[in-house]
Every structure is written in structure tokens, then in C-alpha cells.
Amino acid sequence: MSEILELEAESRTEFGTGAARALRRAGRVPAIIYGAGKTPVSISLEEKEITKYYRKPAFISQLINLTIDKKKYKVLPKAVELHPVTDIVRHVDFVFLEKKTQKMEVPVVYEGKERALGVKRGGYFNIVKRRVTLLCDVNNIPRNITIDVTNMPMATSLKSSKIELPKGCSFVTKKEFVLATIIGRRGAKTEAEGEQQAAEAGK
């Protein structure tokens, strides 16, 4: 099961630019929760706390239990507005999680790409997809998808059909797609080219 973050929030009844500025001066961040056919709920969060968690990896796929007026709501971050200079969180959109499954974007981590076989032979690891869209069980939402690519040779593609996803998750699209490739740098020889030239030299 995914790790669930516990956060406290307060309801807010005043809206508009002036009300938002007053909240921020008080060290709080305006936010809203919507979706799942529910009436949107306007809330505020402690600025330091939400900014701290936003700066951690994969916040946008973080499952959260929000406590508002002693009631708990299971939510996911949808969009985050930052201050253009300080990167402090200024506003957050959350979505209610009421369905058994949720469509969401998840970061992809390519483990060992610097040590991949094709890279060692002079190739370049080309990332095509940094995030993928999955349909996930809401109780098992992955923070990211980690793929070990250390054995990936030169001139190959990493395709979605070869990826083992966490239990309860599937790609939204059924069509096969490429996540990453290892391509030859200018002047670098692929393994096949090297073998062919060696064979010709031995004739």
C-alpha cells in the first residue's frame, strides 16, 4: 500500500484576492478540493508544512489524508501554484478520491542509466518519457515507476510492453509506446557495427 501523508487543514469562507493575501500574510496557503461529483471545498494549509512536502520527490502522486474540521478526506494533489521567485507554495488544487481506481501521472526513474551496457559502449541514454499515465488502485498508488536499465544494450528501445507495473496498476493507453532508447553518439560504433568490421578485418 502507498504511504499516506496526514495533513491538517482549515475550512475557509472568505474568497478573492484580498482574502488570499490575508491568508498568506498569516502563514497559510489557500487551497481547494473538488472532483468525484462532490461540492468543492475551500480550505487553507500551513505554508511551511505544505511547501516542505511539495519539495519532496513525487509530491503530485502523493496520497493524502486531509483532516478538515475533524473529518478526513482522501485526496491527491492536482495542481500547485508557486511564488515565481521563492518557490513557496501559493495555492494547491486537490481532487477527492472516491472511486476504486484513479488515473494519474507518475514519474519514471531510470535506475542505472549511467552504467547501462549501451552507455558503457559509447551510447547516449535518451529519455522519451519522464512521466507515464496509469490507472491505479487508490490504495496502491506508486510514488514513481523505477526501471532498472543497467543491462540495456546499444541501439535498443525500452517499450511499455516490457515494463512490470505495481499490482493494481496499468497503462491508460493499450498501444505500445517507447519510454527510453540508447542511441549511438556521433562517431560511436554500435555493437553490431563493431562485430561486422572485426569480421571483415579478419578475412
From Swiss-Prot:
GO terms for molecular function: 5S rRNA binding; structural constituent of ribosome. SUPFAM superfamilies: Ribosomal protein L25-like. Keywords: Ribonucleoprotein, Ribosomal protein, RNA-binding, rRNA-binding. The keyword Lipoprotein does not apply. GO terms for cellular component: cytosolic large ribosomal subunit. GO terms for biological process: translation. InterPro entries: Rbsml_bL25/Gln-tRNA_synth_N (IPR020056), Ribosomal_bL25/Gln-tRNA_synth (IPR011035), Ribosomal_bL25_b-dom (IPR020057), Ribosomal_bL25_C (IPR037121), Ribosomal_bL25_long (IPR001021), Ribosomal_bL25_short (IPR020055), Ribosomal_L25_dom (IPR029751), Ribosomal_uL5_bac-type (IPR020930). The keyword rRNA-binding applies. Belongs to the bacterial ribosomal protein bL25 family. CTC subfamily. This is one of the proteins that binds to the 5S RNA in the ribosome where it forms part of the central protuberance. Part of the 50S ribosomal subunit; part of the 5S rRNA/L5/L18/L25 subcomplex. Contacts the 5S rRNA. Binds to the 5S rRNA independently of L5 and L18. This is Large ribosomal subunit protein bL25. It comes from Rickettsia rickettsii (strain Sheila Smith). The lineage of its organism: Bacteria, Pseudomonadati, Pseudomonadota, Alphaproteobacteria, Rickettsiales.
